[in-house]
């Protein structure tokens, strides 16, 4: 019932427009369905696992935002079920129910952008499935399952790089289990080998497939070489400010639930069953905290990596508190108190989020969560592109809105689907600008989109964006394109198409300009 309730909320909001990360994964998944290695047309820091999951979802349910979010609904439900199984095996059925409910609630929250199908949802799904399978393998002494658990940990890494930390946790947990019993060095070594071989297998297959496509150099540069810059770009002071900006907001969306989880963190001090599981829960907590801290960006959806262990701690609090009351001979009314307090905390969180979860339509939800980001407008722009281009045409988006490529079913004239690397403070920025200019000029896209919205650029002040990229943009558009439409973003977005766009002299604070190639 818990899974069904939260699935119904997600289903109501399935048509929320894709945000830009979703747009990237959806476009890459679309390319995979066409038999194209996404790194050929998408320069991305992300590993290909989530794009492959998107391809599967799009192939099953259709190529639109609703399909993506129905896929997320199923992934979230499966994750909740595996968390129920883990917590039940660890702390009992009551803990399992509370854990599943907590995860379903917290992972839906707007403060972690839980309605968007971010890679972190897929990392968590494979990680918790792997954890459940690893515990099953060890409890039932089924060595072959350790290899299968390793494969799942490897897939968690392929969804997004921080997923590797869950594999590190698995190694530590396996070692802890081995050392807590009569030592069998050979058996432990075999178990390590099975786990690591399983984790390496999907990664090796991925590298072989990309190498065969001829795009391994591009893949390696973006996902490993250039990622080193990205992962060290935020100073510690700025990272702490980002944590203070996003962390408290997340907690205040479900304060009662987070307090219960905090109580669960202390449970090993006052409950024997929680004490027996302390290495499992608290080492997983440590790894999850490290996972959300990598790079010090602390973006809202990064916190999804923390939610499984927070949910386990909430389950531990309610279950262990009930167990302690039972052992002290409490009355039936007192025995149900921990569960009732948890239900009250859940209901209060739902009430605090009632506008987004129960009242707003999908477009309103997008505007409420993402503010001036042009995600609803991207859909309209893409429809115009699709109606006025042919299937084999290419387009270019000068802005960080890859969802336009996905919606329009048109391929990108350049691999730079985000402008951020081009305008960040990093050694490759000017070189990347020149590369993008060359790719666009060589492709001569049929339509070009210029996104004049700050969140689509976020330029560093000391990068040569005005001198190089924007100067070229103005000249290139003037020489080769004519205005086809404008999305004027104000209190309510106003769209102007065709000849009317040429006559429009009252641009809004934020605008998206659509240009078509001049006839030769």
List each language-model region with its residue ranges:
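Transmembrane-helix motifs of polytopic, lipid-linked glycan transferases
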Residues: 70-94, 98, 105, 129
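Short periplasmic/luminal acceptor-recognition loop of GT-C membrane glycosyltransferases, typified by
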Residues: 149-151, 164-168, 358, 371-424, ...
